[in-house]
Amino acid sequence: LALLTILTLAAPLYAGDPLKMYPFKRLQPPSPEMWFGSDNLGRDVFARTIFGARISLMVGLLSAASAAVIGLLIGVVAGYSRSFDNVVMRVMDGLMSIPTILLAIALISLTGPGIGILIVAIAIPETPAVARLVRSVVLGVRGRPYVEAALCGGARLPKVLWRHILPSTIPALMVQAATVCASAILTEAGLSFLGVGVPPEIPSWGNMIASSRLYLAIAPMTIFAPGACLAVTVLAVNLLGDGLRDMFDPRAKRRR
């Protein structure tokens, strides 16, 4: 995952132009000039794969960060406010019952495709899971002796939340954020494949697979390259989440 991040950041130094077309080099096999060959429009598949990683990582990280921040705020307040809890958790339950892809398609259909709205469309349905997780942690921590002692000692609630409650939610939040990031990368690829995600002029793994699916027999690398990168990236993010869980909860590792 770190290697992929470095490669994407340094892409302008070694990769070609992912948008430049070579009409006389359509569907070419891998060569020293084009390592992964070219697609049906003569574009460099290697350059498009590397620059497509930027989109996937950016959408995944920003969607996970957005869902984590919003879910953290909702979960903390819901865990401490009974009246707020009853109302907001029912809304979260309603959002969780809607498939992520369908909700994202509905939002994008109303506003039009774009990276910003794509991040929002992915983050919204992922937020309820984060909020419920944080809420469960807060409910378990709020009754502990050190929290009650701080409140009895005259500490204000915001200070108690900041010093005692929020730190307890960070481990679970980081693990959940990794899960959301992996899910967001897959969702972005699926939406782009369907034509409602990243605009067609921007290289992404999803729209690369969609535009090359008819040429699988002629130029398999046009699909294999983005597909393999997508699978490896999602696997790496999931393994990162597993590693964080084992680090924060060694008992979970022993149980496995």
Functional labels for PLM-detected ranges:
Residues L1-L72, V76, S81-S83, I101, ...:
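Gly/Trp-centered helix-boundary motif
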Residues L4, V76, A104-S109, L118, ...:
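Transmembrane alpha-helix boundary and packing residues in multipass membrane permease domains
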Residues W35, D39, V69, G79-Y80, ...:
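Generic hydrophobic transmembrane alpha-helix motif, especially the helices
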Residues R43-M58, L62, R82-M89, L139-G143, ...:
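Amphipathic cytosolic juxtamembrane alpha-helices at the membrane-cytosol interface
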Residues T49-G52, S56, V77, V91, ...:
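Amphipathic alpha-helical segments that mediate coupling or scaffolding at interfaces
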Residues V59-S63, A78, M89-D93, A121, ...:
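Alpha-helical transmembrane segments of multi-pass integral membrane proteins
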Residues M96, L107-T111, I122, V137-V138, ...:
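Glycine-rich helix-loop "coupling/hinge" segments at transmembrane-helix boundaries
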